[in-house]
UniProtKB/Swiss-Prot annotation:
GO cellular component, one term: chloroplast thylakoid membrane
UniProt main location, coarse: plastid
Keywords: Chloroplast, Membrane, Photosynthesis, Photosystem II, Plastid, Thylakoid, Transmembrane, Transmembrane helix
Organism from which the protein derives: Salicornia europaea
Protein name (database record): Photosystem II reaction center protein T
Gene name per UniProt: psbT
Length: 35
């Protein structure tokens, strides 16, 4: 069960960092169609 908690924390941290970098930089990716 501890592994699930650590995985959740890891994903949450990566998600926060990803969103922080994504919102900090200008959204150039939205101009192109990314699939």
């Amino acid at each position: 069960m501890e592994a699930l908690v650590y995985t959740f924390l890891l994903v949450s941290t990566l998600g926060i960092i990803f969103f922080a970098i994504f919102f900090r930089e200008p959204p150039k990716i939205q101009t192109k169609k990314m699939k």
